């Protein structure tokens, strides 16, 4: 089944701003969140689709690639796109093409081709509490690193790579085709300018080995879902002396049992008994900083919202914390005994004797229905 257009998934125009994208994403994510739609497979699939769309459109580089190439531009399994990293390969491919046509550029004229290491991406899943308060953590990132045995040379210890006999160490050869002289990557040394006659036993002459490296990462307080933390130089090592790439730690916040986040604000559903709604009372509600008291006035209806200022999250760049919004849901009692039902019927009779004084909204609704059918 073909994927839907990501802009269509979020219901925004292709020129939508970052704020418009974020607002649309949060609205749809809250609507289709699995916690709000238990045992609903359709809602679960829609939530995944919405999350996937925002992960692409909410990232400047991925959005540019998607706008130009469609789904293929952001699919790591698409032909020619590569899946290990975000840097180096794509630009270098174009460099190789134009270098072969027009005589080479960027490093070939003075020696072997130099490549910057690929950027790495690491997805880190954290809780809402961790996002709010910040913390330090340790991550293990799979990456290519210089071989310790040969120190990245690719040659067996005690030996050294030799200058390539084909290209003389330049990493490129020039081919004469009629009136044109075309420069190409050396087929013998593959652009390194060196030949390895006795390869390193640890890396088989590659000069790099695959291993997990452990890094300490500081997660700032107030970080939001989809934000990225850049760790300079902790990507994959460069080739032929090129600089290392960067590591991008992308934050994913787990769904919370109570709260939904909207920017720096938090929202929760406050379920109260119908007796408390009618008579009023004091209730304790949870916050990320502990408990708070809410005074429920008499006659509170479902849908009423209580705002607790400063009980939200203080964003990474915010001066003040957001607010907590508690949305009331009045619970109707179930599994009543015969005695309880009799008491309620007696109570209902007393309400009816009072006319519309006790239930003005119900009376108003009844009047509107009568007018509709009259």
UniProtKB/Swiss-Prot annotation:
Zn(2+) 2 binds at residues 164, 167, 186, 189. The keyword Metal-binding applies. Binds 2 Zn(2+) ions per monomer. Belongs to the DnaJ family. Participates actively in the response to hyperosmotic and heat shock by preventing the aggregation of stress-denatured proteins and by disaggregating proteins, also in an autonomous, DnaK-independent fashion. Unfolded proteins bind initially to DnaJ; upon interaction with the DnaJ-bound protein, DnaK hydrolyzes its bound ATP, resulting in the formation of a stable complex. GrpE releases ADP from DnaK; ATP binding to DnaK triggers the release of the substrate protein, thus completing the reaction cycle. Homodimer. This is Chaperone protein DnaJ. It comes from Bordetella petrii (strain ATCC BAA-461 / DSM 12804 / CCUG 43448).
């Amino acid at each position: 089944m073909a994927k839907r257009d990501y802009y269509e998934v979020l219901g925004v125009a292709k020129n939508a701003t970052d704020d418009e994208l974020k607002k649309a994403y949060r609205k749809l994510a809250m609507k289709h969140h699995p916690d709000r739609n238990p045992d609903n497979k359709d809602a679960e699939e829609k939530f995944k689709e919405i999350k996937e769309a925002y992960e692409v459109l909410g990232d400047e580089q991925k959005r540019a690639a998607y706008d130009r190439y469609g789904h293929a531009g952001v699919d790591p399994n698409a032909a020619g796109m590569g899946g290990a990293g975000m840097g180096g390969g794509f630009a270098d491919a174009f460099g190789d093409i134009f270098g072969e046509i027009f005589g080479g550029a960027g490093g070939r004229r003075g020696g072997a081709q130099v490549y910057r290491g690929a950027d790495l991406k690491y997805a880190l899943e954290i809780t809402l509490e961790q996002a709010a308060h910040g913390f330090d953590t340790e991550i293990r990132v799979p990456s290519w690193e210089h071989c310790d045995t040969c120190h990245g040379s690719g040659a067996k210890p005690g030996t050294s790579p030799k200058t390539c006999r084909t290209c003389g160490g330049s990493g490129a050869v020039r081919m004469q085709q009629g009136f044109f002289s075309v420069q190409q990557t050396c087929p013998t040394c593959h652009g390194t300018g060196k030949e390895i006659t006795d390869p390193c036993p640890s890396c088989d002459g590659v000069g790099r080995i695959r291993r997990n490296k452990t890094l300490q990462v500081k997660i700032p307080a107030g970080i939001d879902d989809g934000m990225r933390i850049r760790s300079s130089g902790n990507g994959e090592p460069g080739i032929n002396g090129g600089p290392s790439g960067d590591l991008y730690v992308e934050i994913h916040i787990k769904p919370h049992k109570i709260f939904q986040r909207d920017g720096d604000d938090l929202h929760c559903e406050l379920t109260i008994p119908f007796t408390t709604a009618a008579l009023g009372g004091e209730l304790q509600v949870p916050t990320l900083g502990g408990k708070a008291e809410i005074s429920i006035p008499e006659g509170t209806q479902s849908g009423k919202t209580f705002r607790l200022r400063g009980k939200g999250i203080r964003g990474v760049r915010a001066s003040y914390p957001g607010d907590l919004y508690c949305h009331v849901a009045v619970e109707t009692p179930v599994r009543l005994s015969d005695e309880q039902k009799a008491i309620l019927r007696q109570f209902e009779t007393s309400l009816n004797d009072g006319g519309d004084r006790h239930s003005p909204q119900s009376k108003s609704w009844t009047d509107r229905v009568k007018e509709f059918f009259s």
